[in-house]
Swiss-Prot record:
Name of the gene this protein is made from: fabH
Name assigned to this protein: Beta-ketoacyl-[acyl-carrier-protein] synthase III
Subcellular location: Cytoplasm
PANTHER family to which the protein is assigned, alphabetical: 3-OXOACYL-[ACYL-CARRIER-PROTEIN] SYNTHASE 3, BETA-KETOACYL-[ACYL-CARRIER-PROTEIN] SYNTHASE III
Keywords, comma-separated and alphabetical: Acyltransferase, Cytoplasm, Fatty acid biosynthesis, Fatty acid metabolism, Lipid biosynthesis, Lipid metabolism, Multifunctional enzyme, Transferase
Region annotated ACP-binding, chain positions: 261-265
Recorded domain comment: The last Arg residue of the ACP-binding site is essential for the weak association between ACP/AcpP and FabH.
Reactions performed catalytically: malonyl-[ACP] + acetyl-CoA + H(+) = 3-oxobutanoyl-[ACP] + CO2 + CoA
One Pfam match: ACP_syn_III_C
Length: 340
């Protein structure tokens, strides 16, 4: 019998760099309240959000991804030609096909590499980091560009008092590759399809295309806020605990906590339930960025590093959670401070 060659990869991997792109337009709570009966105080008290960014009309999840990816590659002191694979985590690419990642890879000079989109809602970045890590450890790549990119603003019903103020646009990216010490722990991930309706698109694309009434239902994003809050607040702490156990670290060793930026109150409950140190840094990028779905974790990491709140090499617990319902968590070492 002819043997098929065995494949061996790199075991010690980490986040080599980070890149972020935030659209220019800042949207305040007061602007949001021009369309709904609410107030800046009400929104901030319940979500922790003061402002968010909305992308320009000509920008898309794909163009945002290119900008963040370009910065991540530059911050890793690499060229696009040195990237072996590109994964774009997004739920807001305008086309069902083709995926955005091949065009993103080509735009960044990573011509001919495997490139694909990954859709796991707000857990998308964690899923993509997990897949990238497995690719490298499995020997099919050595440097993988992971991008979380979302343009959520067109999917918002700006008259929906329940969620129109939650979301924003943006993109964050990392290069995953070989490091001297282990920089990415095992990924703890999963889903609960019994709650798939908790975060959903109002109407599917085929029904929308066939609808004769231009004033009829549109493919807006809807959230069952109470259900999602309870699920995240009480279940994601268990996921974080499992991620720490898988990485063989304790809560007292975690320097930085970067949960998905969905709601400040959820994140405070998670930090308490995880029994993190009193001086552990907790990401709060949501205050000025809103919920950017798959982009929220890398954007929050960039803010922590750029402001000096976190340092390269700090041990960080990442937890992403959202539509699906889906979740993914890892313990990682924070990458270098981005200069781009």
């Amino acid at each position: 019998m002819t043997d098929i060659a065995e494949i061996t990869g790199i075991n010690k991997i980490g986040l080599l760099s980070l890149g972020a792109y935030r659209p220019e337009r800042v949207v305040t709570n007061d602007e949001i309240c021009e369309r709904i009966e609410s107030s800046d105080e009400w929104i901030y008290t319940r979500t922790g959000i003061k402002t968010r960014r909305f992308a320009a009309d000509e920008e898309t999840a794909q163009t945002l991804a290119i900008e963040a990816g370009r910065k991540a590659i530059a911050n890793a002191l690499l060229t696009g030609a040195e990237i072996d694979a590109v994964i774009v985590a997004t739920s807001t690419h305008y086309l069902q096909t083709p995926a955005s990642a091949p065009a993103v890879a080509t735009a960044l000079g990573a011509q001919g590499v495997p490139a694909f989109d990954l859709s796991a809602g707000c857990a998308g970045f964690g899923y993509a980091v997990g897949v990238a890590g497995d690719m490298i450890r499995g020997g099919s790549a050595s440097k993988v560009l992971v991008i979380g990119s979302e343009k959520l603003s067109p999917a918002l019903d700006m008259t929906d008092r329940g969620n129109c103020f939650i979301f924003g646009d943006g993109a964050g990216a990392v290069v995953v590759g070989e490091t001297a010490e282990q920089g990415i722990g095992p990924t703890v991930w999963g889903s609960d399809g019994s709650q798939s309706n908790a975060i959903r698109q109002d109407i599917d694309w085929m029904d929308f295309a066939a609808a004769p009434d231009p004033e009829g239902p549109r493919p807006y994003l809807r959230i069952e806020g109470t259900s999602v809050f309870r699920w995240a607040a009480f279940e994601m702490g268990k996921v974080g605990q499992r991620a720490m156990e898988a990485a063989k670290v304790g809560p007292e060793q975690i320097d930085v906590f970067v949960p998905h930026q969905a709601n400040t109150r959820i994140n405070e409950l998670l930090a308490k339930n995880l029994h993190l140190r009193a001086d552990a840094v907790i990401a709060n990028d949501i205050e000025h960025t809103g919920n950017t779905s798959a982009a929220s974790v890398p954007l929050a990491m960039e803010t922590l590093l750029s402001t000096g709140a976190a340092k390269p090499g700090d041990l960080a617990l990442l937890i992403g959670y959202g539509a699906g319902l889906s979740y993914a968590a890892q313990v990682v070492r924070m990458p270098p401070v981005p200069f781009e």
